[in-house]
Amino acid sequence: MKALFLVLAAAMAAPLVLGAPKDEKTKSTRWKITGQLEEACSCNAACPCWFDSKPTRATCGGNQVLFIQKGNYGNVKLDGLAVANYAQSPENQTMMDSFGKWNFSTNYIDEKANPEQRKALEAIAAAVLPSNNGSKNFKTVYVPITRKIEGKDHVITIGNVATFTGHLVEGGLGGSSKITNPPGADPLHHQYAQGKTTRMIYNDSDQNWDWTDTNYMLGTFTLDSDQYAKFVAGLAQKMAKKEKTESAEKK
């Protein structure tokens, strides 16, 4: 976990000052987004990776898709846009401990976005997902990103390379089943409703996925740059405390 804290802190801090649109290149471009998270992966539900456990298959391959209802990056409006990331862990390793060594990480930016909005979405994705630091095998693609809600089913389509359909599962006491503050939680995943996919297909990044009845998660979010700055600071404090404890134990 030591390596994880160091990598995540560096990964999330950098986008707070880099990647700003031309007229927003300052040390503290502030941003805020509100919307919904659609997420699915190859693991059986619920995905154990959020508990720093190994995936239920040889690898965990999955996505995070942000549908922004309202947002801005500095003066750049992001209302109605979307951004997604697909990634996969190495075999027999957790997503958390293998961060930086993932088999691949691919960002998908809403093609509706203009050039300034694309740069803004890329910067936010790097902070929130954080996608471009997860793997040396990284690329960004501009595609249509859509969602249809058909009864209980949420159908998400990423260009012509990916689609998945998910639905929530009922909790034992009624209502939807929710997971709150798992060990791997970040501001985006402070709480999410648990579900399962009907089907998940992905044909890009040298992959050919076609799975059914796997992990699906649905969340709502209101995120901003101040929140992530505090999150990074918190990771740094945890790292310092951990190093101090380990140093004392060696004496």
Feature-to-residue mapping (PLM):
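Bacterial N-terminal signal peptides
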Residues: 7-15
